[in-house]
Amino acid sequence: MGSEPGYFGEFTVQLWTGSTDDPVRYFILRKLNIMKTSTRTLSFSLIILLGWMARGADIGFIEKFALAEDRKEALKLLIPGTPDYYYYHSLDAQLRGDGATVKKHLALWVKRHGRTAQVREIQDRQALLDYGANPDATLAHLRRELGLSFNHSRVIEGQKPKHPVALDSKLISFKAYQERAYRSGDLSGVEERGLEKLEHDKLNATRLRHLLSRLQRPDVVNLPQLIIKDLRNKYSRGFGSHNIHRQLTKAQMDELLQLEPSLINSTHYINAYLIKLAPSADTDTRFNLAERGKHLNRIHQFTGRLAPAHNSLKANAIYNLLRFQQSQGQYDRELFMEYLKLPRPVAYINPKYREVQLKRPGISDVNLNADYSRITGLPPIGPDERLVRDFFLHFFRQDADFDQYLPLVRDTYLKQAFAEAKLVSGVGDAERWYSMLSTSQVKALQERIDLDFAPANKVFYKASEAVSLKVNIKNVKKLIVRVFEINTFNFYSRNLHPVNTAINLDGLAATREQAYNYDERPLRRVERNFNFPELKKRGVYVVEFIGNGRSSRALISKGNLRVLEDTGSAGHEFRVLDEDNKACAQATLWLSGNEYKADKDGLIVVPFSNRPGRQTMVLRNGNFSALASFVHQSETYSLDAGIYVDREALVTGAQAKLVVRPVLRLNGNPISLKVLEDPRLVILSTGRDGVPTMLELPVGEIKDGEAFIHEFTVPDKLAKLQFTLKARVENLAAGNKQDLTDQGTFALNQIDKTLKLENVHLARVNGAYVLDVLGKNGEAKPDRAVSVQLKHRDFKGTHSVSLKSDPSGRVDLGALADIQWIKATGSDGATYHWEISRGRYGRVAQPSVIHAATGDTIQVALAGPLNNASKGQSYSLFEVRQGTMVGDQVKAGTFRNGFLEISDLAVGDYTLY
C-alpha cells in the first residue's frame, strides 16, 4: 500500500468528548531532501485538527466550520473582506480541490491585508497540494520560503572544486538584493533603512501599502502623493490606517488636503491635524496667555472649516475660546453668536430652532461632555449656562433689545436675563424691566447676595507685583476683608500638600482686616476693585471677603522654589532656584524630619536611602517655602573596567599590552574613581591542558578619564586569558564595604583543541576584502571551497555563493559596498562570522537626549564620511509636539569638521535621526 505514488496514510483522531473511526487524510512528500538550515517553519495545517489542542475550550467559528454539514452555510456567517473570510473560504476551496478559487481569494487577501501569517499558511498548503501536478513549483516555493540555497560543495578526493576565486559584485548589488526581496510580493524582505532607497513611485499597490505601514518618519520624498495614491486604491482602509499618517508634518497635512479635499471629513485626519496645532513642548499655556490665545484661535480657525457632523468638536473649540476671552475681559459677540447657533440639549435654546436644525442631514446635537483633550488639550464643555448667562448680562447692559437672539434662544430666558442685566446695572426704566419678571423672580433677585470674583481677575502674579482683586458685590451693606499670611514651612512640613482655600483659618491672626460700608440698593450689582499693596513679597496668602452671611476666599501664591538635581558620590545633589531661575545660595531642604543645608557653593547633598521611592520635600529660602518631589534612590555602584588587548599581539613569548580604562558609576551616573579602595588587577591564564595560572597585582591610583597599561609576556600553549579589575567602595547607605569587579575574557588558539589544520581569515587590502585560507603555520591553502553568506544593510535576507581559494589561498570578495556581515563556511564545515559594517563606518557613542539653551549650537559627532550626500539623505530633524512630528527642520543643520552642527532652533523638542 505504502509504495504507490501519492499514497495517503490513515489514522484515527480523538475529538473533544468522543472518538471517531473515520479515516483522515494526511500527506507525505517522498524523495525530498530538506536541509536543516530552514529559517521558517512551514505553517500548513489540516482542518480536521485545527483547534482540537485545547479540549472543551470555546473555540468559536472553527467549531462551526469543522462540524457543519453544509459548510457553505457556515461560511455565510463571515463578514466579506475580513481575514477570516478569506482564510476559511480558501481553506474550504483547498479541501474541495479547487486551486483556482484559492488563488483568486489569495490575490484579494494580499491586496487588502498584506502577506500575513495566515496568508503564508494557505500558500504553503497550496504549494504542497500542487506537488503532484507541478513539483518544480512546489520545490521552488520550499526553497524560497525555507531559505534553502544548496550551495555546499561536495568534496571529492583528487578533484578541485569548480568555483570562481572572486565574488561577482553584481550578485550583491542593491538591485540584486531588491529583486530577491521582491519575490515575497511585499517589502518584508527590506530593512527599515532600505525603505528610503526604493523607487517609491514604481511600487505596486501592495508594496506601497507595506511601505506606508512601516514608515516611522515623514522624511520620504513626495510622501503626500504616495499616501494619496494608496488612499485612492480600492483596497485602502482609509486615512489613519498607517502610523505614518499621524506623523506627517503640518505642511504635509496641508498638501495632503490640497490633493484630496475630502479628507477634511475624515475624523482621523481631523484628529491628526489638531495635534499639529499644539504649542511648543516648552510652552506652558497656563502661564503664557499669549500662546494660549494663539493656540485656541488656531483650533477655532481649523474647526470652522469642518462639516456639521463635527459640531461637538466645533462647539468645544468655540466654548474654550469664549472662556479664555472672558478671563481677559473680552466679549466677542460674533463668536458668541456662532456658539449659540450650534444645536444642543440645553434648557435655554429655542426648541423650534433646534428641531429645524436636527432635521437637516448630517446634523446632530452637540455633546457637551465630549472629551477632546487628548487631541486639543482642551477640557470638555460640561454645563455651559453660567458662561452663556455671563455673556448675555454683559451685552444686555448696553443693548436696546434682544431681538437678534430670539431665533436661537427661548424668549422667556432672554427676558429674564435682559431685565436682570438692566436692573442690577441701574440702567433705564426700572418699571419696564420689572414687568418682564414675575413677582417671585423680582423677589429672588432682590434677596440674592452676590460676592463673586470677576472672571477677568489675574490668575498669576509675579513675586514683586501688586495684587488687586475685582469682586462683584450685590446686597451687601457691610463687607469685611481679611488677609492671612500662611506660614508655608509649618504648613508644608506638617501636611506635605499645597495650600488651598479650604484651609482652616481658626486661630490664625489676620495680617490685615478692613471693613467697607455700602449704601447701594439690594438690586444693584457693582464690580469693585480691592488693592493689596502689602502683598509685594513671596508668600502664600488667603484673602477672605465676608458680607451678609456669605464668604468668598482667594488664594494668592507668589513666588516659587524648584530644584536642579544631580547624582554625586555622597548622594543626591540639589541646587535650589527661585521663580526667576536664580540660585538660592542660603536655601535649605527639609525631608522626613531632617533639614539639609547648602554648602558654600549652594549645593545641598541628601544621602541615598535604604528605602528608595518618590519623596516629598520642603524647600526653604528665608521665610518662604515650597514643595517639591524627587525619586530617592538607593546607593548602587557598578564598575566598567574597559579592558582591551590587541589580539594580534597575543603571540607566544611576545610582550603584549593590556589597556584598562575603568568607569565607576553610581546609580548609572559616572562618578570619580577616587572613591575606589584597594584596586587590583587579576590575570588568569589557562593553557591547553586546562591548568589555570593566576597573578594578582595592585594597581595603585587610578585617575579619572585616564587608562593604565600593564605589559605582560604571552604564555606558551595559551588557550584563554581572563583579566579582572576588582576594588572596594564604601556604601554609606548600607554602612559597609561593597566589592566591585569587572572582567574581560579572550579565547585563543581554539584550533588547537580540534583536528583542524586550516582556518579562514578575513582581511581588508587596499579597500577590498579578501578571505585567506591558511594552515596552522600560515601557509596558503589553494583550491579550498568556501561558502560565503552575505547580509546587505538594506535587506533582511542573505545571499550565498560558492567560491574557492586561488593558488595563494585567497578569495577576492571586492569592496562589499553596503554589506553588513559575512559568514564563511570552509571545506571542513567550520563557520566564521564577521560584522564588517562596524569597522567600516565606525561607531560614535551619542547621548539619547541633548539639552541646549536657545541660541546654542548643538554638535553631533559623525561616525563616518557622508560621501557627498545631501542633508536630506544623511539625516532628518523634526520638531515634535505631543508625540508627533510637526515641522521639518533639516535646514538647521550644517556639516563641519566631522560634526553635524544644528543651530537657530526655536524653543521646543526635536528628534534627530
PLM region descriptions:
Residues 5, 11, 15:
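Cationic, low-complexity basic patches in intrinsically disordered or flexible, solvent-exposed regions
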